[in-house]
Amino acid sequence: MIVDISCNITDSQFKNVEDTILKCKEAKVIPIFVGVDYTTSLKSCNYAEKFDTLFYAGIHPLYSENSVYIPVNSDRCIAIGECGLDYYRLQFSSIETQKRIFKVQLDLKAERYFLHCRDSHRDFMEILSDYNFKGVVHSFTGTVEESKEIIKKGLFIGINGCSLKNEEGIEVVKNLPLNSILVETDSPYCKIRKSYAGYKFVNNYQKHKSNEPYLIYEIIEAIANIKNIPINILLDTLLSNNINFYGERLVECFEKWRL
C-alpha cells in the first residue's frame, strides 16, 4: 500500500468522490484527507469515516483571519492541520494573525501535526522551537539548508509535484535522507507539469488537468530516479516512514483496504 499524505478531497474539482476512491483502491493508494478550516475538516471527517481512511483537522494560514479552530472529535483524525505560516499570500491573512492562529493550534499539544510553510521559514522554525511533536512539513518548496533545519527538528518532509518545480527542488530531494521523506499529491493541485524540472524524471507520465491521489506514483518514480535508487527500496522506506509517523491507525486502514 502507498499513502498519499495530502488529498484535498473537499475541493470542488473532485466531481465524483466515489470514483476517486475506486481509482485509489485499484492503484493500492490510501489517501489522507486535508481540512483547511472547520467546514472542510468536518467534511473530511465524514469522508474518512465513510471510506475507512484518515484525515487532518485544522486551520490553514490563509483562513486565519476569519476562523476559529474547533477540534473534530473522531478517531479518524490523525493530526492537527493543515496549519502553519504562508507569507506568499498575505492579502488573505496578516503575519500576526497567522502566527497567533498557528500557536493556538500548537498549544493543543497534539501528537502529530500536518504543517504548511511558505516563504516563512525563519518565523516558522522560531515558533516550532517552543514545541516538540511528530510532524510533516508538507508540499516542501524551500532550500537544501531549510530542509536540513527541518530534519534536525525531527520532522518529515512532504514531497509533491510543486516540490519538483525547479532545480533547487531537485537538489533538495537529492540531499534528503530516505527516512525523512513522505509523499503526497496535494490533489487536485500540485501535479508535475511538463515545464517542471522534475518532469524529466518521470517515466510514466499521465496527462491530466487536475491531480488525483492515484497519480502519486509519478512522485515516487521521480524521487527514485533523482536519487538513483531502485523503486522497491524507496517503496519499502516510504512504508516504514508512514508507519513510523502515523502508527497503528494507519496499519488498521491497510487491513481494511486490503479486504
Swiss-Prot record:
CDD domains: TatD_DNAse. Its EC number is 3.1.21.-. One of its GO terms (cellular component) is cytosol. Binds 2 divalent metal cations per subunit. PANTHER family: DEOXYRIBONUCLEASE TATDN1, TATD FAMILY DEOXYRIBONUCLEASE. Keywords: Hydrolase, Metal-binding, Nuclease, Nucleus. It is found in: Nucleus. Putative deoxyribonuclease. One of its GO terms (molecular function) is metal ion binding. Belongs to the metallo-dependent hydrolases superfamily. TatD-type hydrolase family. A divalent metal cation 1 binds at residues 82, 186. It comes from the Eukaryota. A divalent metal cation 2 binds at residues 82, 116, 138. This is Putative deoxyribonuclease TATDN1 homolog. Its cofactor is a divalent metal cation.
